[in-house]
């Protein structure tokens, strides 16, 4: 595989991860709303017509809960077999959102680093250091797909494949 093909595959896989994370959060919010009849009605009637500058009711769809809070609330409301392991999902999301991805010179793969806040001695601890290999992408895509399948089951949505 050429360097260009490897880079293009990296970009495609990164897009899959980001898209899956967004879908997972949105799906979890939809499950929470679905279980609250009042909120479900508001979401179905208000949000399709909402415009910038409008105000809407506060609910799981419109609140500012972060991914961790949203998934914890989802787990409290969803059936046991639909619950998600929150920690690896949030860890991945935080690494992609707040980490540093780079590659230079002879490096075969891009590298993802996430740093903590500086310590009293002025140094910065490394929280995460991963080579973004094909296996790393595949493991994370599989993990998110399993979580998405659980959310889909909790929503009782039909899975459709693109043709």
Model regions and ranges:
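Amphipathic alpha-helical interface elements
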Residues: 1-69, 80-91, 95-108, 137-163
């Amino acid at each position: 595989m050429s360097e260009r093909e490897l880079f293009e595959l990296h970009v495609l896989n990164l897009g899959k991860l980001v898209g899956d994370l967004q879908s997972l959060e949105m799906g979890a919010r939809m499950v929470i709303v679905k279980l609250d009849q009042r909120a479900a009605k508001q979401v179905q009637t208000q949000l399709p017509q909402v415009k910038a500058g409008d105000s809407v009711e506060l609910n799981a769809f419109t609140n500012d809960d972060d991914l961790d809070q949203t998934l914890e609330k989802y787990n409290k409301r969803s059936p046991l077999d639909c619950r998600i392991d929150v920690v690896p999902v949030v860890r991945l999301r935080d690494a992609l959102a707040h980490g540093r991805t780079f590659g230079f010179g002879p490096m075969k793969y891009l590298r993802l680093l996430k740093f903590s806040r500086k310590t009293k001695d002025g140094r910065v601890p490394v929280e995460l250091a991963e080579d973004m290999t094909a296996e790393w992408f595949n493991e994370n895509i599989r993990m998110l797909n399993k979580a998405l399948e659980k959310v889909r089951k909790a929503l009782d949505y039909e899975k459709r494949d693109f043709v």
